């Protein structure tokens, strides 16, 4: 071993030797000071993008609503980065988007001004690490503003967990998706090209090794963060499998997201009338405009299915009801519109961005088929809602839809799964060709299968877990 390597190891050991007591010296006063500031009977949700209007926000508002009813003697807070929205505006959006009414007298918003730090656009390289560290900074801002008795990370900022554990708060994690998963490690190790593993890296031995090392080190950090939670909850089987593996804990419970099944069951579908009277096959995609949602595949499917449907005597339309959170999402919409122009499908494409709840209900009532294309969707609230609303679901054959939702019920088909563009096109044609009776059978058993995803089930399981820390 060279003198340089020995010197480097020696310096590293010395650095650690001095750092450990320094960290301990900082932690002790931090914990003591936090104890003086901690407010009893307070529950705070760390959800910097609480006004985004996605599935994660449905969980947030439903959780607060059920806790307001079950534990009215506690006070509820939300750490929010939506500094441009008032409390009234945020609660109004929760009601309009999800139909969820909250008691405004028992909820306060604590505004965080450093939210921009966690946005991926700032970090072109080592994005996960820098976002995690930025999340820690944001958590420290939250800590500075208030230390609650119970801290709930409902959005997935792992380093917020040890920060509030050290402050003496009871810590709860509700994980929608793992920051890093076994699948991500496998993709890099097998050198597959995906949206988060570029061809440049996949084709290079050195870069693949470097990224795999980085992922493994980050997985260790994620493991440490996960150990800080007193209670761990996940949204489905896929997420549970990865979290139990990476966090090395077996006490992580599945609490399915609250799907407003009853409300969607009451939607009166007019899809068959549209099919019969106007010869229109209406497709619907519901989901935020994010890269992993793979809207580009939906456009390609629309392009490829258009001609064979026309030969069968049908028109086809695709409505994309997507949530746009920021400028990055708006840019993706522009790119998708340009792609639609190239594919000559703009006339068949309908955009409904940041759609209110009432308008979403209308779109669901008109849709014959709901199309979902995200690979390894962690759960899939939109999939459940689509099935409840009597649309025929065509989902990606992976993640939560495959493991939890689109599974035969009492031996009967409840929907369809596909992976490739060709499979999606083939399945759409099959659904149209199979006839009204078969489609109605699929709808009937799909709707029967959804009781386990209702709001009542969510409230029961959520309160059971939360009681452990109250």
UniProtKB/Swiss-Prot annotation:
**UniProt xrefs under InterPro entries:** ALG11, ALG11_N, Glyco_trans_1
Q: Which catalytic reaction applies to this protein? A: an alpha-D-Man-(1->3)-[alpha-D-Man-(1->6)]-beta-D-Man-(1->4)-beta-D-GlcNAc-(1->4)-alpha-D-GlcNAc-diphospho-di-trans,poly-cis-dolichol + 2 GDP-alpha-D-mannose = an alpha-D-Man-(1->2)-alpha-D-Man-(1->2)-alpha-D-Man-(1->3)-[alpha-D-Man-(1->6)]-beta-D-Man-(1->4)-beta-D-GlcNAc-(1->4)-alpha-D-GlcNAc-diphospho-di-trans,poly-cis-dolichol + 2 GDP + 2 H(+)
Chain ranges on the Cytoplasmic side, renumbered to this chain: 37-131, 153-378, 400-470
Its chief place of residence is: endoplasmic reticulum
Mind telling me which GO cellular component terms the entry cites? endoplasmic reticulum membrane
Q: Which residues lie on this side of the membrane: Lumenal?
A: 1-15
- The catalytic activity of this protein is classed by the Enzyme Commission as 2.4.1.131
Membrane spanning residue stretches: 16-36
- Give membrane topology per the record: Single-pass membrane protein
Q: Does the keyword Endoplasmic reticulum apply?
A: yes
The keyword Transferase is assigned to this record: yes
Keyword tags: Endoplasmic reticulum, Glycosyltransferase, Membrane, Transferase, Transmembrane, Transmembrane helix
Q: Which domain of life is it from?
A: Eukaryota
GO MF: GDP-Man:Man3GlcNAc2-PP-Dol alpha-1,2-mannosyltransferase activity
Stretches within the membrane that do not traverse it: 132-152, 379-399
Compartment(s)? Endoplasmic reticulum membrane
Concerning its family, UniProt says:
Belongs to the glycosyltransferase group 1 family. Glycosyltransferase 4 subfamily.
Q: What does this protein do?
A: GDP-Man:Man(3)GlcNAc(2)-PP-Dol alpha-1,2-mannosyltransferase that operates in the biosynthetic pathway of dolichol-linked oligosaccharides, the glycan precursors employed in protein asparagine (N)-glycosylation. The assembly of dolichol-linked oligosaccharides begins on the cytosolic side of the endoplasmic reticulum membrane and finishes in its lumen. The sequential addition of sugars to dolichol pyrophosphate produces dolichol-linked oligosaccharides containing fourteen sugars, including two GlcNAcs, nine mannoses and three glucoses.
Name of the protein: GDP-Man:Man(3)GlcNAc(2)-PP-Dol alpha-1,2-mannosyltransferase
- What is this organism's lineage? Eukaryota, Metazoa, Ecdysozoa, Nematoda, Chromadorea
Give the gene that encodes this protein. Answer: algn-11
